[in-house]
Amino acid sequence: YTIVGRNVPGGKPLEGVTLNGAQLQSLQTNVQIPADLGVSGLGVQKMVTSRIARAATTAAGVAVVMNVSDLPSVVESGDNDEASKATKIPVPVNVSGQFYPARDVDWYEFNAPQGAVFWIDLVSHQLGLPTDPSILLHRVVKNDAGEETVTVVASVDDPGDRNGRIGQDYDDSTDDPSYKFTSPAEGTYRIRVLDNFGVNRNDPRMQYELRIRPENPRVRLTAELRQLKTAN
């Protein structure tokens, strides 16, 4: 893993990378991921971040919380800011990437058989970041001459109930988009991901995880540590 921060023991300066005027450092190190998930002892989580599986560990002598997933992992790499340069990925998958530099757009491409069902989650706001991600899903069909016909399958920004829940007593909503995808036909599909707040922001800390996962019903139990207001 690469640890980035200030006063990192054994860290090397990152040329041209600063935060609030301070030089940042990086360190390549091994990090032991605990077998048991959880963040016991590291404080109360925000509602919006409680959806993500986490594990508490240490890196460079500092306690950290890591996001974890049991999906096959891929790290964003290369020039994929155009549909024609989309990064080919397997499914299911967990892609780790960045909304960086400013105006960054990333494209990914995968194949799916007819009738396959996947949930497509773009996770960033749930990582505790001030982002507003969105996804665009295309179906791509090529003729014998290699010419493409592109059809929009879905364009997803905020979840449908987001606006109605902001400011309510129990608000665990998020700006992260999530879409249930049922493949209409065997073939190729492309996903574009971007941050609506990233037009003028040039910050490598704005990370995301693109998760394409099988449908798997589950139960999540949360508790809110404040008194709820009641109607008169």
What does each model-found stretch correspond to?
Residues 59-92, 218:
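Predominantly extracellular/luminal regions of secreted and cell-surface proteins
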Residues 42-59, 191-193:
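Short, aromatic- and glycine-rich surface loops/edge beta-strands on solvent-exposed regions
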Residues 5, 54-55, 86, 90-99:
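Glycine-centered structural positions embedded in regular secondary structure
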Residues 1-41, 97-232:
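Acidic, Ser/Thr/Pro-rich low-complexity intrinsically disordered segments
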